[in-house]
Structures are given as structure tokens and as C-alpha cells.
Amino acid sequence: MIHEAPQVTVSVVDGPCIAGGFGMACAADILITMESSYFKLSETKLGLIPSQISPYLLNRMTFSKARQLMLLGDDLDGSTAHSIGVADYLAHSYEDLYKVISQIKSKVMLCSPNAIAKTKSHLSKARNIDIQRSSQLFFECINHDEGLEGLQSFFEKRDPYWAKSK
């Protein structure tokens, strides 16, 4: 698991970051996004629940904002993701991106690997992330009729039966 790695982990988002990819990006210690990127949680539109990734999302934004994104499937652009705390750094160009990565690398190289590992372990326990419960909720949804329909409609490139047109 990304969040359990003893090293500092960095996610770079350059383009669409949707559903589980959004959660994986949020699981990293540091998240850098390009201004042109966008983030989206589409699970509820597929009859699923973003439960397995919710602990990581809740570590990066307010509960209220996470609830809105999870329930409605709204998009966040890179700038908004940065302004609400999803992303730690916002890069406007690849030159900016490489500068930020270089700065982070330089800072990490000054830190004790053991101290980083112990700090990460301590922070994880302090947040009490219940991945097993989150996984169980996802399993329940994916095995429900609506979860199966949502996945089938996704692969068939059509709306699920409950999606009403505007």
C-alpha cells in the first residue's frame, strides 16, 4: 500500500485523475498536480461507493467537500484541488513540476530514513485509517444489483438504468 511505504511517496497528477486513481494519488505523502489536471469521483454514478479511497480523501480535504465530491461526482480542476488542500503543490508547466520535484527530493535527502518511517507509522496510527471496513463496504456495493449494473453500463459505454437525462 502506498500510504504504508516507509519512504516519502509523491504522486504527480498530469491529466484526468478519476475514482480509484484519485484515491491512489491522495494516498501519497505529497501530491503535485498540473494546473490542467482534473479530479473526479465517479463511483456513485456506477452504483458503487468510494469507500476504499475515502480515508485518503478525508486526509486531504474537509469532510464537507469530500462528501460533496463523493455524492455528486463533481469535477475539481488542478487549481481548485490545490486551493482546497487535495494537492500540496500546483505546477503551471513541466518546468515548474521538475523544480518542485527537485525541491522535495532535496528536502527528503536531508531527513533520516528511520525518522521518516517512524513518523509515517505514527501519523497513520493517529489517523486510525480503517481500510478493512472500507474494503468491506466496497465489496457489498460491487456485489449489489446496482453495482453490477453500474460496472456493466461503464464497460458498455451507456448510462446505468437509474441515470435520468436532464
Range-by-range predicted roles:
Residues 1-46, 75:
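Glycine-rich beta-to-alpha active-site loop
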Residues 32-37, 87-133, 162-166:
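C-terminal long alpha-helix characteristic of the crotonase
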Residues 55-64:
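Hydrophobic, secondary-structure "cap" segments at the distal end of domains
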Residues 65-74:
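Short helix- or helix-capping micro-motifs
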Residues 150-166:
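Short, basic/aromatic-enriched C-terminal tail that caps enzymatic domains
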Residues 74-80:
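Acidic, divalent-metal-coordinating active-site segment for phosphoryl/phosphodiester hydrolysis
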Residues 69-70, 122-123, 137-143:
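Helix-loop "lid/cap" segments that line or gate small-molecule binding pockets
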